[in-house]
Design a protein with these regions (language model features):
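Short, well-ordered secondary-structure micro-motifs
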Residues: 7, 63-66, 87-89, 113
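Conserved phosphate-donor/acceptor-positioning beta-strand/loop module used by diverse small-molecule
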Residues: 54-55, 67-96
Length: 155
């Protein structure tokens, strides 16, 4: 959002999709990740040992993360049944979407952004088919099972 705001672009679903796709054509599929890696390196330099990154979208981004952080990347895919995902996207308070827009976004994300690859190779999957509290509980369980955190209070 920051780059769009700096460019004076109104933030809508359509403008976000167009902006991301144009930037990926202009600067490469991994343009966002390059900026994120810089921030991650700053966190590491400041002493941070474990970092959670949200929004791994493309296969190119996945390969870059493996190269930048060899042996340190674990991918967790959080997925929801299609009907529930559509319902949530239509009913969300910020930027709700119509079914047509959701279908277009799904096609765009798979065809133009290679989004299926990172999901397919994930080491862990969380099925997000309940409440937000249920999702948080599943995330807490996973962070403990993978020794990312010793307890939810330490994350």
């Amino acid at each position: 959002y920051q780059m769009m705001e700096e460019a004076g672009i109104e933030i809508t679903w359509e403008s976000q999709q167009k902006f991301r796709e144009e930037m990926r054509v202009k600067e490469g599929q991994d343009f966002i990740l390059k900026r994120v890696i810089k921030n991650m390196r700053q966190l590491i330099d400041a002493g941070q040992k474990k970092i959670i990154m949200d929004g791994l979208y493309t296969w190119s981004e996945y390969k870059i993360l493996l190269h930048e952080f060899p042996g340190q990347v674990t991918v967790v895919a959080i997925v929801a049944p299609k009907h529930l995902r559509y319902q949530r996207l239509q009913n969300r308070p910020e930027r709700p979407m119509q079914p047509r827009e959701i279908k277009e976004r799904d096609c765009s994300e798979n065809e133009n952004m290679q989004k299926g690859g990172p999901i397919a190779i994930a080491e862990h999957f969380i099925i997000n088919d309940g409440s937000l509290e249920d999702l948080h509980a599943k995330l807490d369980e996973l962070t403990q099972a993978t020794h990312f955190c010793k307890s939810p209070m330490q994350c």
